[in-house]
């Protein structure tokens, strides 16, 4: 019977997300960027664009054309 508790604990440890890896947060930020009419840039925005937010926790920027 105690083996079930051990197996449950190991399964739980493997399913817990790693700290600093915000998969759900990054997905929501990308979606919010696209809803606002932007795109996700890896390094910097193009000269005719402005930064309107972030696309991920790792520093990708959400850029949109200047109005």
Swiss-Prot record:
InterPro entries: Defensin_beta-like (IPR001855). GO terms for molecular function: CCR6 chemokine receptor binding; chemoattractant activity. PANTHER family: BETA-DEFENSIN (PTHR20515), BETA-DEFENSIN 103 (PTHR20515:SF0). It comes from the Eukaryota. One of its GO terms (biological process) is defense response to bacterium. Residues 1-22 form the signal peptide. The gene is DEFB103A. Keywords: Antibiotic, Antimicrobial, Defensin, Disulfide bond, Secreted, Signal. One of its GO terms (cellular component) is extracellular space. Gene3D superfamilies: Antimicrobial Peptide, Beta-defensin 2, Chain A. Disulfide bonds join 33-62, 40-55, 45-63. Belongs to the beta-defensin family. It comes from Pan troglodytes. This is Beta-defensin 103A.
